[in-house]
Amino acid sequence: MNAIPRVALVWLLVAQVLVILPHLAYMPLWIAAMWLGCAAWRVQVFRMRAGYPRAWVKLALALLAGAGVWLSRGSLVGLDAGAVLLIAAFILKLVEMKTRRDALVLVFLGFFAVVVGYLFDDGFLAALYSLLPVTALLAALIGLQQSAFASRPWPTLRLAGGLLLQALPLMLLLFLFFPRLGPLWSLPMPGNKGVTGLSESMAPGDIAELGRSAELAFRVRFEGALPPREQLYWRALTMERFDGRRWAQAPQWSGEDALHWQKRGPELRYDVIMQPSSQPWLFALDVAQTDQTDTRLMSDFHLQRRQPVEQRLFYRVSSWPQALRESSIDPRTRWRNLQLPMHGNPRARALADELRQAHAQPQALVAALLQRFNHEPFAYTLKPPATGADGVDDFLFDTRSGFCAHYAGAMAFVLRAAGIPARVVAGYQGGELNPAGNYLLVHQFDAHAWVEYWQPEQGWLSVDPTYQVAPERIEQGLEQALAGDSEYLADAPLSPLRYRGLPWLNDMRLAWDSLNYGWQRWVLAYQGEQQGAFLQRWFGGLDPTRLGLLLGAAAILSVGLLALFLLKPWQGRGDLRSRQLRRFERLLEMHGLRRSPGEGLRSYGERAARVLPAQAPAIAAFVGAFEAQRYGHGGADDPGLRLRALRRALPWRLVRTPTRDGRGEEQA
C-alpha cells in the first residue's frame, strides 16, 4: 500500500526535467549528467532490474555532489552555491525514494526549486514556463493518492490542470490584497555578476565600450506628452575628481541643508523600471524627486539609494529640468571643481589661457570652445586612436577622434584651466520609443557624458560638446550617428536591435518588450507602496481589520462559487441517470458506435461489446448497473463509477476496420 504508483513516478520524472531545465542556464553541466544517471537508475529500480543504493553509495554520491559544487562555485554557502546544492539534492532524492512519504518530500523540493528559479529570472517568459513544472508536480502529488493499478497519466494531468484553474480566483485575491512584508535579510543576486553599465570612474574609452552592448538599462513612461529627445539627459552620477587620466566621483552628502535649488519651469512626472546595475544611483532627469523612501537627492543632484540595485526597481519621479541649481557655491565645492593635476597637457592649458584672454565673459568662452569643436575636423567614433600620457592634448590637437567621454573630459579640463568650475556628468541620453506601450527603452549603448559648468546667479549649467560634432547622436540616436561603424553593437551580433530596418521583425521585438514591460510594471512592481496606492484608489485605504474582513468575504465568495461550479444544483438529481446514459452513448459514439433509433440499451451494449471485445466487461458492467438503478430498487453499484471505469478501459487510439454490417469496427 505504501509503494509509489506508476502514474506518480511518471509525473515525478517529467516534473524533474521541467524543474531542472531553466536552472541549467546558470548551473554546471555535471548537474544534467547527474540527472540522466539518477533517472535511468530509478527507472531500472521500478522495472526491478536494479536495487536501491546502499547507505555508503548514498553517502558517496552526496560527497561527490558537494565536491562538485565546491569546485564549480568555490564555496558551499551563498545563493549561487545553495541553488546548485538544492538541485543536486532534488536529483539524488529520486534514487533513494522508496515510499510515498519520500515522494512527497521530492514533490515539495520541486516546488521550492521552482520558486528559487525566480531569484535568477523573474521575467514574463520564465513565469509562463513555471506553470509547466508546477502542473507536473501537482499531477505527481495527485498520482500519489491514486491506486497503484491506475496506468494512464493523462487523466491525472487533466485533474491537476483543473485544480490550478480553480485556484486562480484565490490566487488573484491574495496577490491584490495580501500585505507585502519586507525581507528579513537580503543577499546579492548572483545573476548580476559582470553587469554591464556605468561605473563610479571614467576613462576616455570606458563609455565607448557600452556602445557595443545592446543590454537594457531602464524603461520610462511619462505622464502626458513625451519631452523632445534633445532634452532627455538621464543623470546617473557626477564626476569631479581628475587625476590626469580618469574622472571619478567625489564624496557626496545629502539633506535639505546641503541642497540649494529652486523649482522653475514645467514639472515632468514619469515612472522608471530600472534593470539591476549593482550600483546605488538611480537614473532621472534634472532636478529629481522620487517616492523611494530609501533614496536621497545628493549634493551633486543625483539620486542615490542606501543599497545597490540588485534587482529590477520600480520608482516614480518628478523632475524640473529648468530648475536653478546652486546660485552660489561654497569655497570647498568651487575648489573641487577647479582642481587639476599640477603638470600635464600643456597645450590644453595654453588653449585655456588663450580663450580666457580673448573672452572676458565665461559664457562667451564656453561658446568659443563649442565653436572650436563644431568648426574643426573632429570625428565621433566608438574606436578612437590611443592617446599617451597627455591624453587631453593628444585628443584636442592630434587624433581629434573620440566618443562622448573624450569630448566631455577635454571640455571640463579646458574650462577648469580657464578658471571656470566644471565637472563631468555620466548617464544616458535619449531612448527608443515603443509605440506599443508608449514608453521609452534606454539601452546601454545610450550611455553618454556631458559637462556642467557653474556661473554666479545662474548656478550649474549643462552643455554637451558632443552635439557640436555629431548632432544626430542627440537628435536621432547612436545608431544614426554611427551608421556603418562596425563597433556599434559589436558585443551583440544577434541582437534584434541590429535589424530595426526590418519592420515586421522590429514590430515583433517591440510587442514582446511591451508585454514584458506590462509584466514588470503591474506584477513585479506591485509591492508595498504600489499596493497601498491601489488600495487607496479603489477602497479608500484598508486598515488591518477591514483588510481581514475583505479577505474573509472574498474567500467565502470564492468557495461558494466553486461549490456551485462543482455541485451544479440547478441540474435536477432526478435526471442524473439520463445524463449518465447520454454520457455512455457519447463515449461509444467517439469510437464509431452510434445507438440506432428504437435500439434497447441491452442490445446496444451487446453490439458494442462485439465491436470492442477488450472492453466488453466494462460495457456490460455499466449496462447492468444502469438497469438495476433505473428498474430495480437502487441498491446496485453506481453506474457513474462503472462509466468512469469504461472511460479508462477504452483504448487511446483506434483504427477502423470494415465489418459485415458495413458500420465499421474499431481496433486498438
From Swiss-Prot:
Q: Name one GO molecular function term.
A: protein-glutamine gamma-glutamyltransferase activity
Q: TM segments?
A: 7-27, 51-71, 75-95, 104-124, 125-145, 159-179, 549-569
What triggers its expression?
Is expressed in both exponential and stationary phases of growth. Appears to be part of an operon together with PA2874 and PA2875.
* UniProt free text on domains: The transglutaminase activity is contained within the periplasmic domain (180-544).
Natural source organism: Pseudomonas aeruginosa (strain ATCC 15692 / DSM 22644 / CIP 104116 / JCM 14847 / LMG 12228 / 1C / PRS 101 / PAO1)
Q: Which residues lie on this side of the membrane: Cytoplasmic?
A: 1-6, 72-74, 146-158, 570-668
- Where is the protein localized? Cell inner membrane
Q: What is this protein called?
A: Protein-glutamine gamma-glutamyltransferase
Q: Give the CC-aspect GO terms.
A: plasma membrane
Coiled-coil boundaries: none
Q: Which reaction does it catalyse?
A: L-glutaminyl-[protein] + L-lysyl-[protein] = [protein]-L-lysyl-N(6)-5-L-glutamyl-[protein] + NH4(+)
